[in-house]
């Protein structure tokens, strides 16, 4: 500020610039009390402002442009349209004639779609549905509303079905929606046996049919299905498509057919027999089958076996601590492709989260978001790649909580609530959307690991709030009681735990002084723990899971570095080996395994 000096009464109207000196604008002269300050930011202001502007629009007040769409006139404010749409911003701020017009004609756009998009600009709300998506997406593309384009594509992803996937694919291609196009392609390949029966398949142009049947990932039991699909397509409109048969048949892998089918069905088909190019393709396949010694010289696209992606188990890594903060990100590992890919994030950041799978849905329970302890629960559906927050919360906040499924219930075991270490146990009934307390453990446990084996729930290790524990308790749901069993050989908190080959494995964690790489396993038949070869890295806050018969240790903290590496245990060689890494480093993240019944993981 400028500090003014020697201003006498009566001089307040004169120019005093020359009598001011520059100083700290936030500092008053010495001896003057500093005023109290309270910065204020209104969360309501943006919403309330938009609501008022929208009312002005509805009453046609202060509107400075009228959009003419077909027979419809839509009153609006240029500044709002320009703020939301690059299309309108270019129109109104450039040298185009529309920048000077009060009425602007918009062509090639649906009236109702334009109304919905203008409403969105003023309200931030829109509903995408079957009745409007086919007009809404082209309109959003024209107006360059990327957010609405994404919403429309997300809606169409959820509608994918063998009866409509080809239509959605064509729609995505027309409007350059690359991700939707990729997903529709994958869906078509994985569900080809059903897709080939659809009306959409019969209406395909030849070039799109070739694109589909050329894929190595086409999911068919045998090449016979591909041949039958092609012939059904040709015969659907035989006069038009008969000349296209040789071109399409080149992409059927005839050398992979059985000799009986090749000779008895393909070679005897009148359409094949009457075309020279088709006969040549059949002869090529016969030579491949009859002359095995010549096969190395005959390799090509038609002799390459298809490699459809089969359904299997997929590992999910959820939340955790990374780069100094709790994270909400989630990624999944597919053993068949050996890839980690990001999926939808949770609505909240969660470190120390408990994760388990119930009815093919992934649950994330409690945790800490970096500032608060949580009692909220989220549920992930791999079919839609979406998290839902409509799950009832636990009765108390919990982080470093153990979560497992037993008898159709989701159990939350121990943890801490920010005040004390917990021995409280409760279970969730998905049918009632309700948590109910069951018997508490005999020991308070945070950083506890849990496992289910033989109809019992095991609580392994953890900390009582003072020291790491080696004690183990087992819950009998029939009795609603906990019983103490044999302790581990090592005290461990924040360990990983999983059932593998009918034994409970406990790995890593932290003892009184350091992070651990050691591992041990519990045999319920002998009630004994025995050591297992140590992992290659120390890992506290590690996740442990069994994926397609492999025991995998995921992430953690080695005392210096947050880890994204994975280790796999080889029971025959009694060794651990490194097995790639996640996209994110994760300490205290949860892991869960879902059996993908319809190859959803390969689509998202």
UniProtKB/Swiss-Prot annotation:
Subcellular location: Cytoplasm, Perinuclear region; Nucleus; Golgi apparatus, trans-Golgi network; Cell projection, Axon
Deletion phenotype: Approximately 50% of mice die until day 28 of postnatal development (P28). Mice that survive beyond P28 are indistinguishable at birth, but show a progressive corneal dystrophy, associated with an epithelial hyperplasia and an altered corneal epithelial cell differentiation.
GO CC aspect terms: axon; Cul3-RING ubiquitin ligase complex; cytoplasm; cytosol; dendrite; perinuclear region of cytoplasm; PML body; trans-Golgi network
InterPro entries membership: BACK (IPR011705), BTB-kelch_protein (IPR017096), BTB/POZ_dom (IPR000210), Gal_Oxase/kelch_b-propeller (IPR011043), Kelch-typ_b-propeller (IPR015915), Kelch_1 (IPR006652), SKP1/BTB/POZ_sf (IPR011333)
Pfam families named in the record: BACK, BTB, Kelch_1, Kelch_KLHDC2_KLHL20_DRC7
Chief location of this protein within or outside the cell: cytoplasm
Keyword Nucleus among UniProt keywords: yes
Entry annotated with the keyword Nucleotide-binding: no
CDD domains: BACK_KLHL20, BTB_POZ_KLHL20_KLEIP
Residues of the BTB domain: 63-130
Xref: Gene3D superfamilies: 1.25.40.420, Kelch-type beta propeller (2.120.10.80), Potassium Channel Kv1.1, Chain A (3.30.710.10)
Kelch repeat coordinates: 314-360, 362-408, 409-455, 457-502, 504-549, 551-596
An example molecular function term from Gene Ontology annotations: type II interferon binding
GO biological process, any: Golgi to endosome transport
Domain BACK: 165-267
Subunit structure: Component of the BCR(KLHL20) E3 ubiquitin ligase complex, at least composed of CUL3, KLHL20 and RBX1. Interacts with PDZ-RhoGEF/ARHGEF11, DAPK1, PML and CORO7. Interacts with F-actin. Interacts with IFN-gamma (IFNG). Interacts (via kelch repeats) with IVNS1ABP (via kelch repeats); this interaction blocks the assembly of CUL3-KLHL20 complex.
Function: Substrate-specific adapter of a BCR (BTB-CUL3-RBX1) E3 ubiquitin-protein ligase complex involved in interferon response and anterograde Golgi to endosome transport. The BCR(KLHL20) E3 ubiquitin ligase complex mediates the ubiquitination of DAPK1, leading to its degradation by the proteasome, thereby acting as a negative regulator of apoptosis. The BCR(KLHL20) E3 ubiquitin ligase complex also specifically mediates 'Lys-33'-linked ubiquitination.
Protein name: Kelch-like protein 20
